[in-house]
């Protein structure tokens, strides 16, 4: 962060169910520095016990504020867990509290070593740059990094049900809340001409007002 700020840039990161993204925004002459930073992040991260202990408490507090003390967020989390019974999509991005309590720095190091690898990453560069320059930088900074053996997650199919599922949860809240969800077609590279996912996306906005 200090290096990026000293060079007039800004940076941030975010995590979703499918990937974690790190990004920088700065003047194009700093592009080589961006590749250097991300190359170091990919394979040279230092994970100390002291830093882990401090940061895991920050994550626990974030979970408490955003989910545990927020009835609506907590309900959505329970809904996802009920809807996806075999898929990782049923797990909260921030993690369950019990997992955060039992996590050790060794768990973090194992995850980092396994998944932070050039054969498990996508590099996106947008702006006034030349493709040849970008490919050369990618080769320079990532080409020499050793790949990892990536564990492919193939969860079993979701169990079929005929009459639906329902679950009632109790939480301190001013008003009751209700969520209903439906399994629906998804956008797939195997069937790019399928229009139904897009129609259902529009329908959801219409029904939501």
Kindly label every feature range from the protein language model.
Residues 32-34, 69, 136, 190-196:
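Solvent-exposed, non-transmembrane alpha-helical starts
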Residues 50-57, 64, 70-77, 129:
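Non-catalytic accessory/assembly modules
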């Amino acid at each position: 962060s200090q290096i990026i700020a000293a060079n007039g840039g800004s940076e941030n990161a975010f995590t979703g169910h499918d990937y974690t993204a790190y990004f920088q925004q700065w003047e194009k002459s700093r592009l080589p520095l961006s590749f250097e930073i991300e190359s170091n992040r990919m394979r040279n991260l230092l994970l100390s016990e002291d830093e882990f202990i401090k940061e895991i408490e920050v994550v626990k507090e974030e979970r408490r504020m955003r989910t545990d003390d927020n009835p609506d967020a907590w309900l959505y989390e329970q809904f996802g867990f009920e809807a996806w019974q075999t898929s990782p999509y049923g797990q909260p991005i921030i993690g369950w509290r019990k997992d955060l309590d039992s996590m050790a720095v060794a768990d973090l190091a194992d995850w980092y070593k396994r998944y932070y690898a050039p054969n498990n990453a996508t590099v996106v560069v947008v702006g006034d740059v030349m493709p040849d320059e970008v490919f050369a930088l990618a080769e320079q900074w990532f080409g020499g990094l050793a790949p990892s053996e990536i564990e492919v997650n193939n969860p079993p199919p979701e169990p079929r049900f005929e009459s639906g599922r329902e679950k009632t949860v109790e939480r301190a809240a001013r008003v009751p809340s209700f969520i209903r969800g439906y399994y629906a077609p998804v956008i797939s590279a195997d069937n790019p001409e399928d229009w139904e996912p897009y129609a259902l996306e529009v329908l959801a906005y219409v029904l939501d007002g």
